[in-house]
Every structure is written in C-alpha cells, then in structure tokens.
Amino acid sequence: MKIAIIGSGISGLYAAWRLSEQHQVTVYEKNNYFGGHTDTHELEIEGTKVAVDSGFIVFNDYNYPLFTDMLKKLGVETQSSDMSFSVNNLVSGLQYNPSKKWSLFARPQNFLNRKFLQMLSDLLRFYDDNKDIDVADIDPNLSIEEYLDLHKYSHEFRYEHLYPMCGALWSAPVEQVGQIPYRFVVSFFQHHRMLQLKERPQWQTVKHGSASYIRAIQKKCRSIEWKFAEVKAVSRSPETVLIETVEGQSQYDWVIFA
C-alpha cells in the first residue's frame, strides 16, 4: 500500500521505519529538517567536533521501550547519561545535590541547617504521599501550589527543591511553577519513577547526537520518500486519500497524522 505520513517527529519516523518494511511510504515535513523535537548542533571545540543536543536529549528503557528497541535494531550507539539535580541558591546560600547520599550532605553545615532538614522531611513526605496515589482521583483543577498549601508543605521544600526541579524539567520560571496542575506533576513523577529513592531508571543519551538515529533510519530505509513540503489539505474518498501541497496532489491508500 501507499502510505503518507505527515510529520517527521519520533512518531512519524517510527511509523515510517516500521511500515516501510512492507509498504511504500512517503514522509511529509513542513520544516527544513527531519526529526521534530530532535535538534542536534555540531560545534567545534578546540579543533574537535562535538554534537550538542538542544531538543531531545535523554531516554531510558523503562519509559521508552519501543524507542530503545528501535535504536538497537538500527545499530545506533547509546551511552549512560547523568541526570542528576542540584541546587545552588545565591539568595539563601543553600547548596546541595540529592543524587547520592554522600553528595546530599557534602556540606557539613547542612546537618545543622533547620530549614534544610525541614525540606528533606517534606521531600520524603511528598514522595510517600504521592508514589501510589491514583492519578485519576486527583482534581484536574487543583494546582500544585494549592495542594502544597492544603497539606502544609514548607516554603523551603517548594523553593529549594520542588519548584526548581519542575522549572528545570519544563523550562518554566520558578515563580510560575505553582500554577502547574498537581495531577500533571504527580503523573509525570510517577511515570518516570521520581517518587522513589531506589530503582530509578538509568538514563541514556544517543552517541554523536540524537540526529544519529534519523540518519540511521534514512540509511536503512532507502525506499522511503522524504519530502520537505507543507501539506495544505487532505481529502478522502471511499478508497483513497489525496494529499495537497504547493506542488500539487498525490494519492495514497492511507494517511498518518504524526
């Protein structure tokens, strides 16, 4: 069958990779590059070329089983990545790294810091209260700030840990993090095993930049037709699908919006 895939993010690329084994596939992309969120830049540092990712950066086999399997089958190299989190608050003077037990108390003065110990206490309470909660039972309109107020979480836990972490995860100003839905935060933390102290997933990154897997798909799946073209319209008949671009119309059996 002739199949059109509109969009070349990971969903479109994965579909193209699998379907091209048995079908004639065409991928449409309105941008001037394939890969969607994947954005690898090649920089030269002291005479050495270095691939730097500014879009898609990390993955793990627990949350991304199909993606991990695809990389293995394509022969794309990966390596372990450090997804640690640390805080250096220039206003309060608090510094800590909770990634390891020894790094958490690397600064002896934190042992005697009442606010730091309060933050740790609330952190453990937040983990314990939310790791097994059914997200479906959470009010979708309840913000994380409202939840923290309701359960009397400290200012230190919010501004020295939870808010900075959420801000780093979603590129959001710390001042606005409190408005994020509590349900969304808990769902994300549960899904990525961030509410447990043990058995957290080992994060991985693609060697030579995430764009490596795009090149691998294009090399392996030479039958795929790649088009830099914005789709203007899609129309259906009982038997076919018409894709319209500035170049004209093309006919397919199926279309996938990715």
Model-derived features with residue positions:
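Mobile amphipathic helical/loop "lid" adjacent to a hydrophobic cofactor/ligand pocket
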Residues: 61-182, 186-187
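Glycine-rich FAD pyrophosphate-binding loop
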Residues: 20-44
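Helical element adjacent to the flavin cofactor pocket in flavoenzyme catalytic cores
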Residues: 187-238
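Conserved beta-strand-loop-beta-strand element in the redox core of flavoprotein oxidoreductases
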Residues: 233-250
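N-terminal Rossmann-like FAD-binding beta1-loop-alpha1 element of flavoenzymes
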Residues: 2-27
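Short hydrophobic core segments
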Residues: 6, 250-258
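N-terminal glycine-rich dinucleotide-binding loop that anchors FAD/FMN and/or NAD(P) in oxidoreductases
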Residues: 41-67
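Short loop/edge segments at beta-strand edges and connector loops
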Residues: 7, 82, 227-230, 245
